[in-house]
Amino acid sequence: MSETPIVSNHDLGKYVDQKVVIQGWVHGIRGSNARQFLSLRNSGKILQVLAEKEILGEEVFQTVKHLRQETSVTVIGNLVKNEKSPIGFELVMESIQIVGESENYPITPKEHGIDFLISQRHLWLRSSKQLAILRVRDNLSFAIRKYFHERDFLLIDTPILTGSVGESAGTLFSTEYFDLGNAYLAQTGQLYLETAIFAHNKVFCYGPTFRAEKSKTRRHLTEFWMVEAEVAFATHAENLKLQEDFVKTVIKETVQNSFQDLKVLERDPAPLLAYLEKDFPVIDYTKALEILQSKGEDIVWGDDINSEREQILTVEFGGPVFIQKYPREAKAFYMKVNPEDPRTVLNADLIAPDGVGEIIGGSEREENYENIVQRLKEEKLPVESYDWYLDLRKYGSVPHSGFGLGSERLIAWICGLAHVRECIPFPRMMERLYP
C-alpha cells in the first residue's frame, strides 16, 4: 500500500478525491460546536479544512476548536472540490498533529499601527497582503531578467563594496577596509557595469544599492534594489526609447502574472495600464520650469524639481513624463555635457504619476578622457580613485548610455501603495535597522 502523499496547496488539482497530507499554519478558524472551518496556509495559499466532531470524535475536535493563529500542523484528510472555498478545494479532516504551538501571536486580526507592524516585520510577512506584495516583487524580478535576456543583455554582478564614489559623496555608507583605507557600500553598479560593454555591448545588473540620505519620505529607503543597464554605441535618444519600452513591458508582464495578488491588494490595474498605451512625453528641464512657473510655483533655473512639482507635471501631461537635460551641477560627473547647451547634461528622469515620482534616471555617458577628468575635478573627487574607470576612455572608448530603475518605487506603483517600506521584505530607513 502506497504512503499518503504530502501535498502543497499549489498542487491540489492533482489529488481530488484522494487522501492527502497537508502541512502548514493556522491562518484562522471559525465554526460551531459541531464543525469547525480551519484556514490552513501552505505555499502562500489558503486551504479550507472542514473538521467535524462526528468524524473526529470529541477529544480531537476540541483540539481543533482551540487551535491558535499561526500554530503549525500536519493534517490528513480527503481532498474534495468546493467552489465556495477560496481556492476551489476543501480538505475533510480525518486527523491532525500539532507540530509547533503559537502562544499569544502578536499580530492578531485586529487593526495595528504601521510602526508596530514594521517592528514585527518578521511576522507581518505572513499576512495575505504582505505576501501578495512579495509575489508581485518576485514577478517583477522575473519580468526584468526576462526582458534583458530576450534582448541579448548579459547579467553582470557588480560589487557591493567599492573604493569609488558613484553618485554623491554625501550619501555614502563607509567602513574601514583593512589597511586600504575606506570602502563604501555601492550607490550604483554603473561604473563597473560600463566596463562590461566593451566585452558584450549590452549588459545589466540587478542588486542592492545603498544611499545614506537623511530622508524620511515615503519614497526613500537607505537600502533598495536597482536594475541598471548599459549599452555601447547608444545615444541619449536611443536610451530614452529603451527605457520606455522596458518600463512598459515589465509592468504589463508583472500585472499579467499578478492578477490574483493585485486582487488581494484591492488594486485595479486598469488605470496603470492605460498610462502605458500612449508615448511618454519628453520635456526639457527648462520647459518644465516654465510650466511650473505658469502654475504659480516659485522656482528658478537651477532649482530642484521636488516631488510635489513632479506631480504637477504628471498631472499636466496626464501620466508619466521624461524630464531631460538638467543643470550639470545637479547631476553626476559621468553624464555627458549637452553640446547644444553646456549648462546642461544629456540625461533624463522618468517621473511616474500617482505620487510615485522618479522611477528611472538615465543618461548618455561622457566618453572623452579629458572631459571626464575635468568633471571629476569639478566635483572635488579624487581622480586617482578612478584610474581604472578612466582606462575605459583610453582603450577604445565609444559613445554609450544607460539607466537605473529603483524596483521598490515601481512595485509601489504597480501595487498602488503609498509607501515603499512595504515593497521590500525588510526595509532599511533612517530610523529602522531592525528586524
UniProtKB/Swiss-Prot annotation:
One Gene Ontology term from the biological process aspect of the record: asparaginyl-tRNA aminoacylation
Enzyme class: ligase
Catalytic activity: tRNA(Asn) + L-asparagine + ATP = L-asparaginyl-tRNA(Asn) + AMP + diphosphate + H(+)
Intrachain disulfide bonds: none
Keyword Protein biosynthesis: yes
EC code: 6.1.1.22
Primary residence: cytoplasm
Keyword ATP-binding: yes
Compartmental location: Cytoplasm
One Pfam family from the record: tRNA-synt_2
Family indicated by similarity: Belongs to the class-II aminoacyl-tRNA synthetase family.
Assembly with partners or alone: Homodimer.
NCBIfam families with a match to the protein in the record: asnS, PRK03932.1
HAMAP family reported in the protein's UniProt record: Asn_tRNA_synth
PANTHER family xrefs: ASPARAGINE--TRNA LIGASE, MITOCHONDRIAL-RELATED, ASPARTYL/LYSYL-TRNA SYNTHETASE
Name this polypeptide is given: Asparagine--tRNA ligase
